[in-house]
Structure formats: C-alpha cells, structure tokens
Amino acid sequence: MDYKQTLLMPKTAFPMRGNLPNSEPKRQEQWEEMDIYKQVQERTEGRPYFVLHDGPPYANGDIHMGHALNKIIKDFIVRYKSMSGFHAPYVPGWDTHGLPIETALTKNKKVDRKSMSIADFRKLCEEYALEQINSQRQQFMRLGVRGDWWKPYITLEKEFEAEQIKVFGKMAKKGYIYKGKKPVYWSPSSESALAEAEIEYYDKRSASIYVAFQVADGKGVLPEDAALVIWTTTPWTIPANLGITVHPQLEYSVVRTGGRSFVVASGLLEHVQTELSWEDVVVEKTVTGKELDYIVCRHPFYDRDSIVMNGEHVTLDAGTGCVHTAPGHGVDDFVVGQKYGLDVLCPIDDKGIMTSEAPGFEGEFYDNINKMVTEKLEAVGALLKLGFITHSYPHDWRTKKPVIFRATSQWFASIANIRKELLQAVANTEWIPAWGETRLHNMVRDRGDWCISRQRAWGVPIPVFYGEDGTEIVSEETIEHVSNLFREHGSNVWFEREAKDLLPPGFTSPHSPNGHFTKETDIMDVWFDSGSSHQGVLRERNDLVFPADLYFEGSDQYRGWFNSSLSTSVAINGVAPYKGVLSHGFVMDGEGKKMSKSLGNIVVPNTVMKQLGADILRLWVASVDYQADSRVSDSILKQVAETYRKIRNTFRFLLGNLHDFDPKINAVPRDQLTGVHAFLLVRLNELTKRMHEGYNEYQFLNVYNHFRNFCTVELSSFYMDISKDTLYIEHADHPERRAFQTVMYEVVTALTKLIAPILPHTADEVWENIPGVSEQSVQLTDMPTAEELSGTDELKAHWQAFMDIRADVLKALEVARNEKVIGKSLQASLTLYPNKQARALLEATEGLKKLFIVSNVQIANEGDEVPAAAQQFADVAVLVEKAEGETCERCWQVSNTVGADEKHPTLCLSCAQTVTNHYNDVV
C-alpha cells in the first residue's frame, strides 16, 4: 500500500536555487513597473525625516567594488530607516566636472580640443558625462539600490550650477573669497592648481644636496669667510632662492674644518659632520638664530643677495637648521618672505618649464634641471655633497605625476577666518568611527586657505568680472544675475557670451568708466561643486531637508567631500551640513593587497552579479567589517554564496511547511504556544532586538552574524529538525502541527522583513510565497518590533539547559553511528542517566523522542548503575542502543506496535490511527 499521499510533505513555488543572475533583473523590472521608490515615499510621508545625502561618485567609467560597497551600505541604511518609522528619501548624485572627463575626450576619444571653442569642447564634455551617468545608473540599479534614479542631482545641471554660484556669492559677500598670489600645489601634468584634497603621496627618488651660501655681510656676527649650509631635495628651486631662514631661538655653531668656516644648527652639527665627512672640526663660536637676522649671503651662482631671516617653522628634524628659502615655491617660504619684503620669484610656467627668470635654465623642464643646477653648484664650489633619497612626495591624484609648489595668482576661500566655527562644527557632529572627529579636527586646524580656482575648461566658472583698471567686480547684483543666467542657460553661457552680456542690463562701475569689462577665465575646484550640494540639493529639493542626518563615504573623503562640504556650509550657514558622518575603508583583494590590473586581482561588481547575483554581493558587504579595509576574492564570494544557500534553504523549508496554513484560520493563539514553541518565539524576539541594534549602529556585520546564526543554529539544527516528524506525519489540524506552523509563520514573516534591507530581491521573492500577506512587497511593510517580554527568564533557562543536554545526546548518537550501533538516529533507543538537576529538567520536558529525533527515550531510575557502554557527560550519561521492533513504513520510527493494526501491517499504531481517522478516502 502507498502511504505517500497521507504525508504532508513541504510544497512551495519558492525554488531551491535562486538563479539570481536571471531572476533579479526580472524582479527589478517589477519594481520599476510598480514604482517602488514612489510607493515607499508615499507610505512613509509624514514620518520624521532621515536623510542620507549621497556623496556624488565621479561620472567616468564602470563602477568598481568600492562603489558597490558604498552604494550597497547606503541602501542598507535607507531601506532599514524607511521600515523603521522614518521617511527616508534617497537622491543619488553625480560629480561631473573636472580633468578626467577632459582627458577621456582628448586621449581616449581623440578630440582635438584646440580645433574648437571652449564652449563647444564643454558641450562634448557634458555629453560624455551624461553617457557615463546613464551607464553607472544601470549598474547601481542592478545592485538593487533603491532611490530616485530618474531624478538624481547632477553637478552639471543648470539648477545645481545656479545654486553653486549663490554659495560663492554668499561667501564672497562675507569676505571669505579673495584673490592672491601665493604658492599652491601645481600640477604641470594637469597644467592647473590643485587643492590639498587632490594630492596623494607616493615614494619618489630625489637628489639630496648640501650647499654653501657664502656670507657677504656678517654684520659683525659672522666672519666674512663663513658660509651657511643648507640642505634641499629640490635643486631645481635654487635659481629661485632669495633667502635662508633660521629659527630665532635655536643655537647655531660657527665651525672651522678643511680651511673653511660653516654655520649649522648646533643640534644638527653631529649629523652634518657625518653627512659631509668633516674632520678636525673646531667650534669657533655659537650664536642664536636671532643674532643671524638680516645677515647677507650671496646666491651661489647669480649676482644677487640671499638674506638670512628668522622663521618659526625651522626644526631640527633633518637638514642643517638653515633652510633654503624660495618664496615662490613654498608656503612657509612665502610667509617669511612676505614678512621680510622679498619678491615672489617663480621662474617656472604652467607646464613646468623654466622661464627667463632662471638664466641658464630657460626652456628646460623643471625636473630635468636638477642635474644642471648640481653641476653649476659644483663648478662654483658651493656643492658640499650630492646624494639621493627616496621619500614620500606629493603627486597629482588624477595623473599620478609629481606636483610642485608654484606661486600663481589664484582664488582662495579663507579657512583662517572661519577656523574656530569649523572646529566647533566638527565637535557638534557625531563621528563613526570616533577617530573621524580627530582626523577632521586636525585637518581643519592645520589646513591653509583653500585654493578654489583651476586653469581648466570643464567646470563651473568663477563668477567674477574685472574693471578697466583690473579691479575685481563681484556683488550681490552680479551674482544674482549670473545665477539666473546659469539657471536658464547653464554655465556654458559664460563661455558663449562677452562679459558685458553676462552683467545685469545697464550695469556700471567706477572701475570701468568706458563701460568695458572682462571676465574671469578660471573655473572652480570640483570639490567646490560637490561641496555645495547641501545648498543645491538638501535645501533646494522639496523631498530633502538640511542638515542631512548622515554623510557616508570612504575614509579618503575626510580630506575631500566631508571637508569641502563643511567649509562651504559653515561659511554660509554657520553649521555643518551633516548631523553625523560615517566612513568606510577600501576594498582589497583576498590577501589584503590593493587591486590592480598588473596583479590581475581585480574583482568587478558587474562580473560578480552576472555569475552570482546582486544579493550575493550585498551579503558579502554585510559580512565584512567595512569601517576597516575589507577583502574580496572569488573564494571569499563562494563562501558567502554558501551562506546564502543556507539562508535560502531555511526560507524554503519554512515556506514549504506553510502550504496548507492560513494565518487567519489556523494560527494558534500566542498564549497557547508553550514549551519549545514559546522558547523559539523568545529567541526570535531576541534576534529582532539584536538586528535593530545592529542596523541602528550601522554594524551590519553583527546583523549578518545574528541572522546567519539564527538560521543555522536555532532553526536548521534545532527547531526545523524536530518539526519534521510532526509536520509531515500528523494530520493537517493536529494541534502540535498547527503550533509549529504558527511559529514558522511568525518566524518567516519576521525574518523576511529583518533581512529585506540586505537581500531585497530574495526577501521580496520570499514575501510573495508567504500565505496571507497583503502588501505587494516586503518593502511596503515595517520592521517587526522587539517586545519587552516578561516572565520569560524561567522559560529561557529551562530550554538553554535542555539544549546543553541535547548537544550531549547528539554527540552520543554520533559516536554510536560511527561505531555502527545505529544508522539514522531514528534507529536509536536512549537510556538517560541524569544528575538531580538534569532529571528534573528532563522530566519537565514533553516529547523527548521528537526533541532528540529517536524512536525511544527512557530516563533511568535514581540510583541505577550507569553501564560501561554509556557515554558520560557533565550532567547526564547516555546509553545508545538499537531500538527494538520494526521500522514503520510511514514515519520511519522503530516500534513494537508495527503491525498491530491488521489493515495497516507495515505501520506503527500511531500512524495506523492517523491514516484510519484522516485518510480513509486516500488508502
């Protein structure tokens, strides 16, 4: 007789294999059709706002793993908040101006920039940027990131540019914008000034030279034959030398060696003596740096003086204590030079070519004249030593080529004037990790004024006009007019029209009596673009608020977007644009190495999604400690895919056993769920509480671990395992079966919501298969709440103690299996020899057979001797024997009652009764 039809086996349309690369795009099409983003916003309208403001990625190239990590975590946060009592809009953005797009056109697309006007070239830049945005948008959406993708903010859009001009105008009105000539980071490879945020440090091999500057007028302090010794790693700046700086409080020694007198800091004398191999050194006298002030030296090979000056920046960390000073090539040099009235000599052009102000080196690339300068110094007897060192040196973050300090006329945003307010804003912000506060505090404390001008074409113009006498013209009237022009026509209008056509109608100025005006040709630093987004996006969009609750980007943005946004917002608003700042580390390969084409270790998000699916990638993001550097590789992703498989199987089992369950009809009231069912609901409540804590603290690794452990430990290894006999074997409405189903319904509903921010595709797929749910998507529901359960301590204590005993029993069964005493656990009969405490526990626990998944359990009498074959544990000894009787064809338990019912000779009595009472029409 076939009893299969009397078994209630799992049934579900939820497949074992997710086939995510194929199923996810279909799911995303469904989200698009139903406009899930709009539905979520409408559902949560009226709730308190939670705004995560998107730091705009650069619109160039395919997304990489850093992009994926960043966008996915943002999605975790926004999805969770929208299911947890908040209105959480997410407006993605793109950063679109700057050199990389210019380079992409001229180098990759072979655009001849010189053959067209700036305005036409900028139009090509805009077209390229928009193409890149469309490509990246599809890739970000493929990650499952939910947002207002068809109404993003883009820094090249007219409205954004118009607001950026207003930010500039407000800062200018307050006196925070000025033009000045001073040394700035200059990139010869980009032919433009750079801000500190655009500098990266790499090792570079440089010449290291010691040079003697002969005293011309010792002022009675130094002998006329003495020479001050300087040390530098930039010989190419010697032609620009105008002075030597010493520290006023340091002691300097005048020493005689080899028939010559030299001056070095006393604290560095031993070091210099070793470096220059001086012998028979005699200290003739010591003086303070203050006494050396205004002593006159001669330039080694030009017919001009080099003045000795006092400066607090001189240290004893390296060199000689006498610092070669070229005001056109260093910030400290510039400051001390201004104090002493020196010229700002900078004999180098935009491309790094020496000019006629450096006689003998004109027309040479600056880095090539190091050797020429050294040879010249040697020829005149001024070179004391030539060596080479490898040191950390600033490079252009885009071109990866070295940068220089070069004095040029640039536009600056004053940091000094608002430094106090900036530091207060940093202190008022919540920083995660906490070290972020120290990091940005120190940057703000130490940074100079921000060079905001760039000598490029593709960017937002600096909205300044010039009168006939060269005076800068920027006023509320001109700013308002230019802003309105940009709002109507875009910033390209600046390059399409003459200055007079960009000024308000009838505009006059005493600086232009003839009515002639010119306009600024420089553009703004791209960090000013994205740094203005709090104005152009948070304040201007009706669906967002200022300040944002959270900025979340990579740790490189402390010097970038976090910094520029803070500067512009404090300047015009007096407060930071964010309440909190969260940062993440970088994505490395599986061995912790940086990904690079040369190493062949690059993991590409698009490839991962084609092979494994976006939810696997998202689960990987949840599985790493993202605040530090995280690792990814094919093998790591395979491990994550295995975890996903287990999670999916858990969902499938739960759904499969709800195929005949209607929560409105079949659910067992909560107060009637006792024993193991009540215990599991307590565990679910604890999980819910921990998951909320993890999400709220942005600790997604904790969320991942708690969820995974619940699925594998509480469910797969225990509750689901012990449920099978009841779910499959008992009749449909058996109270115990309905109890299991009720709990499983509660569990699957809660788990689906709890994991929805991390696995949105899978969660919606599960949601569709849960009986009785009304919402079209789990995204349109709220998170389960953790209840404050009272009176559960005793229940938890009982079941936790039982689980310890169960673990011992399972070990004993495993040993018996290995020793061939039994095959499957249902072939076992157990005799337990508990201690007093364990006895009370076991006697108070119903259904031991099902809890241990065996055919028979006996608790030995007190005082019974423990047989030698029993396995001894801390609280119980376990004797495993082969169960006596026959195996029931239907439930697979071994029983002496098999055949007791003549109609069903292969069934145990319990199964025979179930079949007779409930399945007479089937068999």
Curated annotation (Swiss-Prot):
Binding site for L-isoleucyl-5'-AMP: 553
Cofactor binding: number and manner: Binds 1 zinc ion per subunit.
E.C. designation(s): 6.1.1.5
Cofactor (UniProt): Zn(2+)
Segments traversing the membrane: none
Residues that bind Zn(2+): 888, 891, 908, 911
The UniProt record lists the keyword Cytoplasm: yes
Residue interval(s) of motif 'KMSKS' region: 594-598
Location (main, coarse): cytoplasm
Keywords: Aminoacyl-tRNA synthetase, ATP-binding, Cytoplasm, Ligase, Metal-binding, Nucleotide-binding, Protein biosynthesis, Zinc
A GO molecular-function descriptor: ATP binding
Example GO biological process: isoleucyl-tRNA aminoacylation
Annotated coiled-coil segments of the chain: none
Subcellular location: Cytoplasm
Superkingdom in the source lineage: Bacteria
Annotated positions binding ATP: 597
GO cellular component: cytosol
InterPro entries tied to this protein: aa-tRNA-synth_I_CS, aa-tRNA-synth_Ia, Anticodon_Ile_BEm, Ile-tRNA-ligase, Ile-tRNA-ligase_type1, Ile-tRNA_ligase, M/V/L/I-tRNA-synth_anticd-bd, Rossmann-like_a/b/a_fold
General function of this protein: Catalyzes the attachment of isoleucine to tRNA(Ile). As IleRS can inadvertently accommodate and process structurally similar amino acids such as valine, to avoid such errors it has two additional distinct tRNA(Ile)-dependent editing activities. One activity is designated as 'pretransfer' editing and involves the hydrolysis of activated Val-AMP. The other activity is designated 'posttransfer' editing and involves deacylation of mischarged Val-tRNA(Ile).
Domain notes: IleRS has two distinct active sites: one for aminoacylation and one for editing. The misactivated valine is translocated from the active site to the editing site, which sterically excludes the correctly activated isoleucine. The single editing site contains two valyl binding pockets, one specific for each substrate (Val-AMP or Val-tRNA(Ile)).
NCBIfam families: ileS (TIGR00392)
Subunit organization: Monomer.
Protein family according to the UniProt entry: Belongs to the class-I aminoacyl-tRNA synthetase family. IleS type 1 subfamily.
Protein name: Isoleucine--tRNA ligase
Organism per entry: Shouchella clausii (strain KSM-K16) (Alkalihalobacillus clausii)
Gene that this sequence comes from: ileS
